[in-house]
Amino acid sequence: MQWGHCGVKSASCSWMPSLSFLSVWLILSFSLPYCLGSPSQDGYWSFFSEWFAPRFSVRALPFTLPNYRRSYESLLPNCRPDVPQFAFKHPLGILWHMRVSHLIDEMVSRRIYQTMEHSGQAAWKYVVGEATLTKLSKLDIVTHFQHLAAVEADSCRFLSSRLVMLKNLAVGNVSLQYNTTLDRVELIFPTPGTRPKLTDFRQWLISVHASIFSSVASSVTLFIVLWLRIPALRYVFGFHWPTATHHSS
């Protein structure tokens, strides 16, 4: 919903709720690109769409980031073996952002109309006033949705940090399976011999240094050979060496 300017004195205050709602929109819009890549419909995060349903957001629960991480760890055993397929479904539900925005708009609009009904026509000229807008911006439901948006942005960063690993697993046709006996998630490779070979970091570093040294040494050797075999190359770089003169008798 939109509010107009409320005059010269309170022109700056008339945009306070809209800035509050704009921050929610920005958080939700910027968290979308990080969550576009996702597994298939019955994949790892299919339960997140139900877990982030609006019925949980309507209840103003004490939702903190440590509680969210503990909840995520408790939901980790629900992972089912599946081959990752990306860009098919939003891990938190593609309609979740629309639901949040509609709920914010609906709750604030309902509170405004309740104020109008109780205060009568005299409240219309104070609707865009500083006091009314300050009360609206300090509503518990607005603060709660802002907190939910921050939690969702954090969860999107948490999931997007693992998208590279899952994408690499998808290239190798690797699946995930939760082992109830060992209480951990295991990788399932298509064949026993396709397990990737891990290279030691020191060996990798030595090979990189050896490659750099060999390339530099080969280039220096080639330059010396050309310097000795092509005399004109010396004059290109400005070296005019004296040559031996033979005196004829």
Curated annotation (Swiss-Prot):
Residues 1-35 form the signal peptide. It is a single-pass type I membrane protein. It is found in: Virion membrane; Host endoplasmic reticulum membrane; Host Golgi apparatus membrane; Secreted. GO terms for cellular component: extracellular region; host cell endoplasmic reticulum membrane; host cell Golgi membrane; membrane; viral envelope; virion membrane. GO terms for biological process: symbiont entry into host cell; virion attachment to host cell. Its main location: virion. It holds the Pfam family PRRSV_Env. It comes from the Viruses. Residues 36-207 are virion surface. InterPro entries: Arteri_GP2a (IPR003434). The chain crosses the membrane at residues 208-228. Residues 229-249 are intravirion. Keywords: Glycoprotein, Host endoplasmic reticulum, Host Golgi apparatus, Host membrane, Host-virus interaction, Membrane, Secreted, Signal, Transmembrane, Transmembrane helix, Viral attachment to host cell, Viral envelope protein, Virion, Virus entry into host cell. Glycans are attached at residues 173, 179. Minor envelope protein. Along with GP4, serves as the viral attachment protein responsible for mediating interactions with CD163 thereby playing a role in virus entry into susceptible host cells. Heterotrimer of GP2a, GP3, and GP4. The GP2a-GP3-GP4 complex associates with the E protein. Interacts with host CD163; this interaction plays a role in virus entry into host cell. This is Glycoprotein 2a.
